């Protein structure tokens, strides 16, 4: 709570826009937003703290109870098509798991550590796990306290 007067705002998805606009000096952002912001301003740089950070994976799945499994599979096939996967990459700036798309990227993009972090960085990160109910309750209590002051 003592830091609150020093913080521009507590945001997630809008943070990169605020830095690009010059309203904030730094922000906690996802790597895709950082890569997008860097494309707008060469004065910006993305870094992962030496202590590490979290990793995330956006995933698609088909539920066992899906009533239109064939269409769901067609949709996933569509997303995996090279041309569509390339459009998705160009829009979101997140690393692509599609090797054909990666191979078509220019060398500078392939070597961009914001988009494609090296093994040393990834080995120092972890995937967040679901919290138990007590932890969620504590998190919500502390967040409400922070936002209300």
PLM segments and residue spans:
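Ligand-binding pocket segment of bilobal, Venus flytrap-like solute-binding proteins
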Residues: 1-49
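Solvent-exposed loop/turn segments at secondary-structure junctions
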Residues: 32-35, 52-54, 67, 81-85
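Non-transmembrane alpha-helical segments in soluble domains
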Residues: 16, 20, 28, 73-80, ...
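Periplasmic-binding protein-like
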Residues: 1-2, 40-66, 110-111
């Amino acid at each position: 709570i003592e830091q609150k007067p020093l913080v521009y705002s507590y945001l997630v998805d809008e943070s990169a826009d605020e830095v690009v606009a010059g309203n904030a000096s730094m922000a906690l952002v996802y790597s895709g937003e950082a890569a997008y912001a860097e494309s707008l301003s060469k004065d910006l740089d993305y870094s992962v703290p030496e202590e590490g950070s979290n990793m995330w994976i956006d995933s698609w799945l088909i539920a066992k109870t899906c009533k239109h499994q064939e269409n769901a599979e067609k949709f996933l096939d569509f997303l995996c098509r090279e041309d569509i996967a390339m459009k998705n990459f160009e829009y979101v700036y997140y690393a692509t798991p599609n090797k054909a798309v990666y191979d078509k990227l220019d060398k500078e993009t392939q070597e961009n550590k914001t988009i494609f972090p090296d093994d040393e960085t990834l080995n120092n990160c972890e995937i967040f796990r679901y919290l138990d109910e007590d932890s969620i309750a504590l998190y919500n209590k502390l967040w409400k306290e922070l936002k209300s002051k």
